[in-house]
């Protein structure tokens, strides 16, 4: 399955943080969907 995205850190640029949160949302949706 999808691997959990790694947090880029508080010093990361906004684009990286936005990318991380987008991936995290997709990851959670995938995990939630596969669990049931």
Curated annotation (Swiss-Prot):
Subcellular location: Secreted
Similarity section: Belongs to the NPY family.
Disulfide bridge partners, by residue number: none
Function, as annotated: Hormone secreted by pancreatic cells that acts as a regulator of pancreatic and gastrointestinal functions.
PROSITE patterns named among the record's database cross-references: PANCREATIC_HORMONE_1 (PS00265), PANCREATIC_HORMONE_2 (PS50276)
Signal peptide: none
Protein's name in the database: Pancreatic polypeptide
Keywords: Amidation, Hormone, Secreted
GO terms for cellular component: extracellular region
Gene: PPY
Tyrosine amide modified-residue sites: 36
């Amino acid at each position: 399955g999808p691997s959990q995205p790694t947090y880029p850190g508080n010093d990361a640029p906004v684009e990286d943080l936005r990318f991380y949160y987008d991936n995290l949302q997709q990851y959670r949706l995938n995990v939630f969907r596969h669990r049931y």
